[in-house]
Amino acid sequence: MILRLYAMVISYCCAICAAPFQSRTTDLDYGPDKTSEASDRQSVPNNFSHVLQNGFFPDLSSTYSSMAGKDWNLYSPRVTLSSEEPSGPPLLFLSEETVVHPEPANKTSRLKRASGSDSVSLSRRGELSVCDSVNVWVTDKRTAVDDRGKIVTVMSEIQTLTGPLKQYFFETKCNPSGSTTRGCRGVDKKQWISECKAKQSYVRALTIDANKLVGWRWIRIDTACVCTLLSRTGRT
């Protein structure tokens, strides 16, 4: 019994000695490295400021590997980085049109929908929008207003390993040559004073602030044409 007790004590001591020592720093190995993230955020603007003074832009394909990829327009549908001007609307806008206006599979269903079904799309019923709008790719945007109300410079060209990329913005504006330049369509002019105005939304774009720091910021661009009303009687 005494020999067996000695053997158990020796095995327990050996097990304790063989266990690895864990310091308090091992807890920092789990999850993202906050220290490295903070250093990256500080080093990127410094690099950008340095290269801006030299007159050229850095290679962003290594810093932002997904920025120049094919899926970039899925992250920011109204902002596109491309070597040439896009020939059509963003993919998300095309997919939305496909969902809203699906083509019937056969002639029978086409005839049923044309005979007055509720599933007929608005455009096929002859309905018109209150304000005429037009979608355009803006290729020469120089400045914009960010979410803090500051005027920032929009980067027009970015150098990458595959060549220069330009920023294009898909904006929706009020049609200057449309029939709603003097008021909204379908509004009683005797009761209301109407006007079609551009509505702006925020998108992310690569910009330069007043301190010459480059970064992704929220800026305002035209994204819709809406109708504003003013009562002729109460002026409200």
Curated annotation (Swiss-Prot):
Gene Ontology CC entries for this record: axon; dendrite; extracellular region; extracellular space; synaptic vesicle
Entry keyword set: Cleavage on pair of basic residues, Developmental protein, Differentiation, Disulfide bond, Glycoprotein, Growth factor, Oogenesis, Signal
Cleaved signal peptide residues: 1-18
GO biological process: cell surface receptor protein tyrosine kinase signaling pathway; modulation of chemical synaptic transmission; negative regulation of neuron apoptotic process; nerve development; nerve growth factor signaling pathway; neuron projection morphogenesis; oogenesis
Glycosylation sites: N47, N106
InterPro entries, per the entry: Cystine-knot_cytokine (IPR029034), Nerve_growth_factor-like (IPR020408), Nerve_growth_factor-rel (IPR002072), Nerve_growth_factor_CS (IPR019846), Neurotrophin-4 (IPR020432)
SMART domains: NGF
Disulfide bonding pattern of the chain: C131-C196, C174-C225, C184-C227
Positions of the propeptide segment: 19-113
Function: NT-4 could play a role in oogenesis and/or early embryogenesis. NT-4 interacts with the low affinity NGF receptor and elicits neurite outgrowth from explanted dorsal root ganglia with no and lower activity in sympathetic and nodose ganglia, respectively.
Protein family (similarity comment): Belongs to the NGF-beta family.
Protein name (database record): Neurotrophin-4
Organism: Xenopus laevis
Gene (name only): ntf4
